[in-house]
Amino acid sequence: MMVIFLGPPGAGKGTQGKKIAKKIDLPHIAIGDIFRTIIKTSTSEAELINNYVKQGELIPNEIVNQVIKNFLLSSEYKNGYILDGYPRNLEQAKFFESFIKEKIKIIYFDVSDELLIKRILGRYSCKNCGKIYNRYFVQPKTDNVCDVCGSSTFDYRKDDNEEVIKKRIEVYKTETYPLIDYYKNSGNFYIVNGSKNEQEIEIDIQKILKIN
């Protein structure tokens, strides 16, 4: 099974991607995580990518496409995956279709701008296991202690401030809305209400994918 999760930053793609991937025993490929890992390296490519991220700009298609192609053509992904955050525009979609021929289900997370901003501003994660929290909605049961692994070290994303977030959302709309129209006619396009809570969204996705 191959599934694409589409939606603006903060829509919940990463949270649901991890849950669903674990449930159906498939890899979860998060584009944002891939590039954040690259940024941590001491390379000219990392510096270039980091400049785009800091300014709230999308990373150029030619860079994104090559990174994704290298990942997806690896043998570990031959049985399927949950692809989170790619493609983001028509050019990327057509490049994707040039080397992936299998039938794919596309799920779009629909969320209001106001909720997106609050989700992103409040978001942080456990540095040890990656568990995602939010200072407004989902905090650890014990202060400063991860529910999953017990670590007390958390990672707060430095590029997340309101001005940059608003710009990222606007850039996303400009780039991605034409892609949504493109996929609507594919017969494999579905919309979930990303404003619901985690459990409700998970149930909706399970129904679409016909899993228990």
Swiss-Prot record:
Pathway of action: Purine metabolism; AMP biosynthesis via salvage pathway; AMP from ADP: step 1/1
GO MF assignments: adenylate kinase activity; ATP binding; zinc ion binding
Listed PROSITE patterns: ADENYLATE_KINASE
The EC number(s) this enzyme carries: 2.7.4.3
InterPro entries named in the record: Adenyl_kin_sub, Adenylat/UMP-CMP_kin, Adenylat_kinase_CS, Adenylate_kinase_lid-dom, P-loop_NTPase
Superkingdom classification of source: Bacteria
Keywords, comma-separated and alphabetical: ATP-binding, Cytoplasm, Kinase, Metal-binding, Nucleotide biosynthesis, Nucleotide-binding, Transferase, Zinc
Compartments where located: Cytoplasm
Binding-site positions, AMP: R36, E57, L58, I59, G85, Y86, P87, R88, Q92, R157, R168
UniProt key word Metal-binding: yes
Region described as NMP: spans on this chain: 30-59
Biological role stated in the UniProt entry: Catalyzes the reversible transfer of the terminal phosphate group between ATP and AMP. Plays an important role in cellular energy homeostasis and in adenine nucleotide metabolism.
HAMAP family, sorted: Adenylate_kinase_Adk
Domain notes: Consists of three domains, a large central CORE domain and two small peripheral domains, NMPbind and LID, which undergo movements during catalysis. The LID domain closes over the site of phosphoryl transfer upon ATP binding. Assembling and dissambling the active center during each catalytic cycle provides an effective means to prevent ATP hydrolysis. Some bacteria have evolved a zinc-coordinating structure that stabilizes the LID domain.
Subunit field text: Monomer.
Protein family (similarity comment): Belongs to the adenylate kinase family.
Name the UniProt record assigns to this protein: Adenylate kinase
